[in-house]
Amino acid sequence: MRIVKLTEDTKKDILTNLLKRSPDNYGSYEETVKNIVNDIHSRRDTALFEYTEKFDHAKINADNVRVTEAEIEEAYTQVDAKLLETIRKAIVNIRTYHEKQKQWFDSENNGTLLGQKVTPLAKVGVYVPGGKAAYPSSVLMNVIPAKVAGVGKIVMTTPCNAEGKVYPTTLVAAKEAGVDEVYKAGGAQAIAALAYGTES
């Protein structure tokens, strides 16, 4: 991590450099992502597996793309008991917060009905980054609101390493939060697979 000290003397240069990261510089990335999304849409699993090998250096296929219960059980053996306790406490806290956002109705003295209606989707896809570090908080902050809302099925994708392994803390957080299926895929190709579906 680069630490930058913002002072009156350095402020102008720092802000100028930050503003250089404008959307104008993202054209080539956008084109790359569009090509990946279109390729997943047309070639589905074949494209997903090719991109996973290209970007994550992992050879996945229809037989190993989905995380198994055995892999989840193994992940539990690799997560410290104190961390597991922290994950469980975070789940309670996040659930408590989001339950306050559930639907409610009230009526005014003049008969006006006010409120919020929450209609959950039947199934959602959740993407959790994981190329260089584990992000169990991303699992919890995406999955728990969906569970509180009443989503019926939650499918998650997250990158695996070259050996086809997913970070243990990510898998444990997914299991504890109630994810139904976890797939080993990252990046734009994983998000496109969630959106369009593939054979696996």
Outline where the language-model segments fall.
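Active-site-adjacent beta-strand anchor residues
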Residues: 41, 157, 184
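Conserved NAD(P)+-binding/catalytic subdomain of aldehyde/semialdehyde dehydrogenases
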Residues: 178-200
